[in-house]
Amino acid sequence: MARVTVEDCIDKVHNRFDLILLAAQRARQISGGAELTLDRDRDKNPVVALREIADELITPVQLREALLNDLQQVHLDDDDVPDEVGSLSASAEALRLTAETPARNQTSSRRAAAAAAAAAAVDYD
């Protein structure tokens, strides 16, 4: 189990940041079930990815294409359901109704003013 460092791979990928992006992409591929090109030797996926890059078993061009392909994909969550055409008008109607109703603070202050006026109008004679 030889120790792999960034220095071992820097002659294959000249930019350290690119190297890390590509190694992370390969580690994600390995986690997703991609075949290993060398013996794991109890190493974790990022170390295996760096070893594959250092030994030139995986080319940076292949990883770069896979990385760009993954970045271009759009993944919709269950909550991100596209709106229907009619829902826009329903939203506008709900907004209009909300704008017509008085705010909660205004209603309670009006009630308090009415109660005070009623109390003042009581004749104690």
Curated annotation (Swiss-Prot):
Single Gene Ontology MF annotation: DNA binding
SUPFAM superfamilies on file: RPB6/omega subunit-like
Reactions catalysed, as given in the entry: RNA(n) + a ribonucleoside 5'-triphosphate = RNA(n+1) + diphosphate
SMART domains: RNA_pol_Rpb6 (SM01409)
Gene3D superfamilies reported for this sequence: 3.90.940.10
EC number(s) on file: 2.7.7.6
A single BP term in Gene Ontology: DNA-templated transcription
Gene Ontology cellular-component annotations: DNA-directed RNA polymerase complex
Keywords: DNA-directed RNA polymerase, Nucleotidyltransferase, Transcription, Transferase
Taxonomic superkingdom: Bacteria
PANTHER family from the UniProt entry: DNA-DIRECTED RNA POLYMERASE SUBUNIT OMEGA
Subunit architecture: The RNAP catalytic core consists of 2 alpha, 1 beta, 1 beta' and 1 omega subunit. When a sigma factor is associated with the core the holoenzyme is formed, which can initiate transcription.
Record function comment: Promotes RNA polymerase assembly. Latches the N- and C-terminal regions of the beta' subunit thereby facilitating its interaction with the beta and alpha subunits.
Family: Belongs to the RNA polymerase subunit omega family.
Protein name: DNA-directed RNA polymerase subunit omega
Taxonomic source organism: Zymomonas mobilis subsp. mobilis (strain ATCC 31821 / ZM4 / CP4)
